[in-house]
Amino acid sequence: MRSSPYDRANLIADFDSIRISLASPEKIRSWSHGEVTKPETINYRTFKPERDGLFCARIFGPTQDWECLCGKYKRMKHRGVICDKCGVEVTLARVRRERLGHIELASPCSHVWFFKGLPSRIGHLLDITLRELERVLYFEAYVIVDPGDGTGLSSGEVITDERKRQLDQEFPGKFIAMMGAEGIKELLKKIDVESLSEEIREKMKTEQSQQKKLKHAKRLRVVESFRKSGNKPEWMILDVIPVIPPELRPLVPLDGGRFATSDLNDLYRRVINRNNRLKKLIELHAPDVIVRNEKRMLQEAVDALFDNGRRGRVLRGANNRPLKSLSDTLKGKQGRFRQNLLGKRVDYSGRSVIVVGPDLKLHQCGLPKKMALELFKPFIYHRLEQRGHCTTIKQAKELVEQQDPVVWDILEEVIKDHPIMLNRAPTLHRLGIQAFEPVLVEGKAIKIHPLVCTAFNADFDGDQMAVHIPLSPEAQIEASTLMLSANNILSPAHGGPITIPTQDMVLGCYYLTKSRPGAKGEGRTFASTDDVLIALEMGEVETLTPIKLRYTGKVIDLVHAFDTQNILHTEPIEFIKQYMDTTVGRVILNDNLPQDMPYINGLLKKKGLAQLVQYCYLKFGLHVTVHMLDEIKSLGFLYATRAGISIGIDDMVVPSEKAGLVRDAEKEVVLVENQYQDGAITHGERYNKIIEIWSKVTERVSDEMFTAMEEDDRTGRYLNPIYIMADSGARGSKQQIRQLSGMRGLMAKPSGEIIETPITANFREGLNVLQYFISTHGARKGLADTALKTADSGYLTRRLVDVAQDVIISENDCGTTEGIYVEPIIESGEIIEALRDRIVGRVALEDQKDYEGNVIVGVNQEITEDLAAAIQAAGIERVKIRSVLTCESKRGVCVACYGRNLATGRLVERGEAVGVIAAQSIGEPGTQLTMRTFHIGGTATRINEQSKQDAKSDGFARYIGIQTVRSKVGELIAMNRNGIMAVVDDKGREKERYPAVYGARVLVEDGAPVKSNQVLLEWDPYTFSILTEVSGVVHFKDLIDGLTMQERLDEVTGMSQLVVIDSPDEKRQPMIQVRPEGATGRGSEAKKYLMPTHAHLMVRDGEELHAGDVLAKIPRETTKTKDITGGLPRVVELFEARKPRETAIIAEINGTVKYGEVTKGQRKIYVEGEDGEKREYALPRGVHINVQEGEKVKAGEPLMDGPRDPHDILAVLGEKELQKYLVNEIQEVYRLQGVNINDKHLETISRQMMRWVKVEDIGDTEFLPEEIVDKFKFRTENNKVLEAGGRPAQGKAMLLGITKASLSTDSFISAASFQETTRVLTEAAINGKVDYLRGLKENVIMGRLVPAGTGMEYYRQVKIAGEDVVEEPVAEPLDIIPGYDEETRLQYAGGLPEDTGEESLAE
């Protein structure tokens, strides 16, 4: 007896893993409830399903609940009876969603996935090529099944029709040849997987050719999968095909008597028709040709049913649209996985437009009464009955529909302490869904607290948000402890506050803390803050009046620190009845700050407010901070209103110096043009210089404009509103204001190059037609980019989530002794990110001691803010910390290696889904970045190329590996690449270091004293020069006019220049030799300089030179705008571990460079190590070689120009270096955009990319050659083999891109729902893979709790206290979510609150 539909629900939930494998014909028949033999669907008159048809009720179940088809048995009492008239079982109609049927095929058919999916599984097993196999299956050729004796044939050989006839005459009846899937099935039956596996392994041992070895390896992979999984090869050929339940391929009546049907029905009908016709033909003993043709048609119909379009022509429906086959229902965004299993719709939800709710508290949101009434209906009904307002649900319904006054009171009660979740699409990170306490509001719009807008990325120009209601008590508790907006004030991406005042609030606070000299009551002295406030009320002083105040307590004085906004790192000063210069507004602000907060004296801008929030969080915790945020919000709005700021056209002050600056620039441009005319500079240099001139002028004009606005003093006490907005950080940036009232500056062409004539006008003066036209490019490009990049960025996030979704904090300490070193990030001498900021929240791997030897941080201790500051103060250069990269946890990572959970500021807890958090933190700004170009309106902003380096502090110059020569002018010129100019103090400690680039002028001698701002080095940023190290005479070698060099006449200047070109003759190596004077002998004394393609020669043959003179210049490409366009694709390139085009070849060992000869158009270069080891590299001709002969290089240094390939870095320098490279490169892109992401997120992703090993020598392990396996698996297997005394496998570390890594995961469900669904499932089925459901995605798909957070095994035992309490008749409602100001609203720490009653919840 089959289990009834009731018990089935329970069966489903209770399993630990899921296995996929091939189904045998017996298995398919055992699933089936009957054979479908007729292609009919339903009767057109009665609309009842036809018997034995595709919708047959006898096979699939009744169409009405508890009712057989003919109506003889109705109602529940006949449950389980099978009707004697129509043969239908009396049961629920929903069994039509789960009962399968089957079709017995008259002739076997191959399964298209296994025959056609690459690599062809059937082909590999039989060792038949795909083309031959196809010919056999589609009845164009015969295959020998039994070669017989003495025929000279071999089993599995494919022969043509003629050859078969010929053989039939030669050896009648001796051999058997067959056509179609039958033949293939016979062959597959004969295969003995065990012996075949042995045979191939033997062959591989003896095989010499690499090609054949690979072929065997591929074949072995398929054979092994059958051997291990217990699947039988002949199951890849189908005798029976299952018919999926009719409700999953419904036939829906449309109005007008037509029907809309699922494509699957068409495909099944086709199979049934052809199958029935074939049966008849076989019965009639029709001619072979006809039967064969019918079999081929059947095979094609079955192929189309499983995967339409995989082989042959696509079957199309009535309107020429390809039919959706079974494979298509799984694939892609609209397929089963992504549409129905990963993205379900939920009830108890609603959506509406949002408006701002400035009077709400941070944990509240306004919910329209109408919505609340609908969403909380069941709760209201329950409460109405409970209170005795009605006795049945029906009455309750009526009360609610009539909107009886009592209903509103009850709604208030129900809503109290019942959190709701708000979500704004797109949900780019976890803060896109937060929980709030609802406050009922009139109208139809949801009200939102202004401080959570940043997290939701919401504005009020018509955005909509969705509301969801957590129903179960557990869900409510989780929502209110983990997701409440007041508990999420830190960003998981960087650990800084995310609920920071923006826009109006910033403006209000800026205005409030500004001082305006000359205001009423200026300079008065007050004894206390209270006196100040009284004086303000009396009208003696104004808000912006500067005053003196006598104060006792701590003061953070930003005024003395020149209004830096650095609240966190400014030392508070202790005042004891001392006088301080402040303003009335600042007194008001400080009056509203928390009790023990130091007095903050200074002008607060956006950054200052952000730091204030962080300071408060660090010092006083969450509770106080939330309270303060609401205070600041109210103050900000109040004073933004009181300030009455408004913009007029006169506020766009055009600086008086503008005209002069533009005139000067035009003169400079003329000078440059003249230089170009005289041939002193190349075309590229001219372009670069002009761009440079205009960039500088634009900068100058905008600086002048800002000063003019700041000092804009029309009425004696006027504050320029535009300046206030930009300066405070409320709205608008320097660039935008520059366009309003400075000059628009340089614009970019659609190709990305910069147009050299800038727009000198601004929007206030207005643009002329040409200027307007030039502007349109940028504006359009901005819009197009936005649309395209949003999609790209979303796809990147999806891949990141997929690769890291199963990284969960799994244990407290993995016990590793490995770690990574962290240093401050320094670019061109400036500290971009201090050591302090990089190590905070990580766990130390070794004791960190100061110079006296006192331990600052011990082993495995978390580095807090204070400790990090102490380490930096002690002058420690680098710190070794634990990192996700070196974590030894087999699954997930451990607490100690991950460190602090950035969203709480405490150590991370077990069960935290850090992989998903990492993916979201990296993906979310991606979308922000894509929008970046859009706002500025496409004005070209170039990073001005640096051309000199000045010292930041006083000290002494020290050369580190700089080799110099003196030029004829007597200047020192750096002649090597990796030299460094350092500035040291009198004790010889390094304070700054700068790279001395090749060809730079070194302006200070070694050891000379240096003043701060003194220029140390100068160089030409636009060209790369090749210089001579010796004085002497120039000899051209292989520089032949018209062959390897060309004299290019410049039309504009009439000057000619020699340019090296790529010559077709491979033997020639263009080079310049400089022979010192007096050297008579040929050869040896001459210095050789190779000339790369496109070099402009600056000397002529036979000319005399002095050391340090320029031989040739290579123009640099610098003038493309640096926009995130370089950004997003670059990030994707790094995450996908793609090889960059034209990668630089890097040295694999430390050693000395020797030049070799040129062969086959490639130049050989040797690196000789100290120990005599020699490596040779072939560099393409015409590239610029970075190293001179005899120069020393380190392993990993590039030998030529070009980007480095991450795979090379892994091979040469190892995993840690590669990881450092990846993290730094990706960070650089984000840093350019001013996006702050914590390193540990990037580390989490790169760990997933680097956990793979490629097996090179299998030893005695179970691995297959060239297989890519998880390194933990690799290690375990090797240990197992070693214990047994076998030979372990050898492998090399691999770097997989995120897509590849996602598809290599253990879980086939997760991989199939990501990409290439059919390929993944084919592979999994043949291997008989088992999915142990360890990641998040698999569990969501299977409809289980995710194994992270509270769903983790570790927390599953936690029960809600009070679940089995017997309810007293009148229990007062207990609060689950205590009031706003009580201590309980602290962070959720692992257990759950104890005192929860069930009263106020849904039972």
From Swiss-Prot:
GO molecular function, a single term: DNA binding
Cofactor entry: Mg(2+); Zn(2+)
UniProt-listed InterPro entries: DNA-dir_RpoC_beta_prime, DNA-dir_RpoC_beta_prime_bact, RNA_pol_asu, RNA_pol_N, RNA_pol_Rpb1_1, RNA_pol_Rpb1_3, RNA_pol_Rpb1_3_sf, RNA_pol_Rpb1_4
GO BP terms, alphabetized: DNA-templated transcription
Binding site for Zn(2+) 2: C814, C887, C894, C897
Binding locations of Mg(2+): D459, D461, D463
Residues reported in the UniProt entry to bind Zn(2+) 1: C68, C70, C83, C86
Pfam families: RNA_pol_Rpb1_1 (PF04997), RNA_pol_Rpb1_2 (PF00623), RNA_pol_Rpb1_3 (PF04983), RNA_pol_Rpb1_4 (PF05000), RNA_pol_Rpb1_5 (PF04998)
This enzyme's EC code(s): 2.7.7.6
Keyword Nucleotidyltransferase: yes
Binding note for cofactor: Binds 1 Mg(2+) ion per subunit. Binds 2 Zn(2+) ions per subunit.
GO cellular component, one term: DNA-directed RNA polymerase complex
Reaction(s) this enzyme catalyzes, per UniProt: RNA(n) + a ribonucleoside 5'-triphosphate = RNA(n+1) + diphosphate
Family: Belongs to the RNA polymerase beta' chain family.
Assembly, per entry: The RNAP catalytic core consists of 2 alpha, 1 beta, 1 beta' and 1 omega subunit. When a sigma factor is associated with the core the holoenzyme is formed, which can initiate transcription.
Function (record text): DNA-dependent RNA polymerase catalyzes the transcription of DNA into RNA using the four ribonucleoside triphosphates as substrates.
Protein name, per record: DNA-directed RNA polymerase subunit beta'
Protein species of origin: Solibacter usitatus (strain Ellin6076)
Lineage: Bacteria, Pseudomonadati, Acidobacteriota, Terriglobia, Bryobacterales
Gene it is expressed from: rpoC
